[in-house]
């Protein structure tokens, strides 16, 4: 009752922040990992090495990864702003700015898309070569093969990655806990971090359980809707 009555504004704030993050991170990660998978699906020399390089970040502990990105995006002495200064470009507040923290976290999320890339790569290798050759015979180029063969044949793979991306997006926690602590001004107060604060910082276990159930229902409904209209 306390959650939906509006007496706790952080509930709706955390929900909105998480929805915005999911809406930005899922399409970005899907497009980026699909593009990388396409590059690695070509007959490029040393593609096994590049596949390993792109997948390795997924096995790095998130806490260690967060520490590295905090140094890179430090607004005072971070690598990113030093590069911008060297190029005579305006610097950014990155994780310290209300308007820039979510886009920065979306960019950081691309670091962990190696598993999505591997799944896309496996799906691309299952696309029948005969269909691609038939498009070439009919005079079709790269875009014709991509739009009329590759993407339609990979619909189940894309669907799986979208569903998993949404689920993982709503469960984001470590980045907020380690890198921003929900700040600045609660602009990165993600839903699961809000749940954590309710349970372990404020001791409101009843509220935390209700928040967890709402998260379960949101993910279940979104998954059902995607199944329905996919």
What are these regions (language model features)?
Residues 1-230:
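A structural signal for multi-pass alpha-helical bundles of membrane permease subunits
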């Amino acid at each position: 009752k306390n959650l939906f009555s509006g007496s706790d504004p952080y509930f709706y704030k955390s929900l909105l922040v998480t929805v915005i993050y999911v809406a930005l991170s899922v399409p970005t990660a899907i497009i980026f990992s699909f593009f990388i998978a396409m590059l690695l699906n070509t007959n490029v020399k040393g593609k096994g090495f590049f596949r390993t390089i792109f997948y390795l970040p997924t096995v790095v502990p998130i806490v260690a990864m967060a520490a590295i990105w905090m140094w890179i995006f430090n607004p005072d002495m971070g690598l990113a702003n030093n590069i911008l200064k060297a190029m005579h470009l305006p610097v950014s507040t990155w994780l310290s700015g209300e308007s820039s923290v979510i886009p920065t976290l979306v960019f950081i999320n691309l670091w962990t898309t190696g598993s999505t890339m591997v799944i896309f790569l496996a799906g691309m290798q299952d696309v029948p070569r005969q269909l691609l050759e038939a498009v070439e015979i009919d005079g079709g180029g790269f875009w014709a093969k991509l739009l009329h063969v590759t993407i339609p044949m990979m619909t189940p793979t894309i669907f799986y990655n979208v569903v998993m991306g949404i689920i993982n997006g709503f469960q984001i926690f470590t980045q907020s806990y380690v890198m921003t602590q929900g700040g600045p001004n609660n602009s990165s107060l993600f839903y699961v971090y809000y749940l954590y604060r309710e349970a372990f910082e404020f001791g409101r276990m009843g509220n935390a359980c209700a928040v967890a159930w709402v998260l379960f229902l949101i993910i279940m409904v979104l998954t059902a809707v995607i199944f329905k209209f996919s």
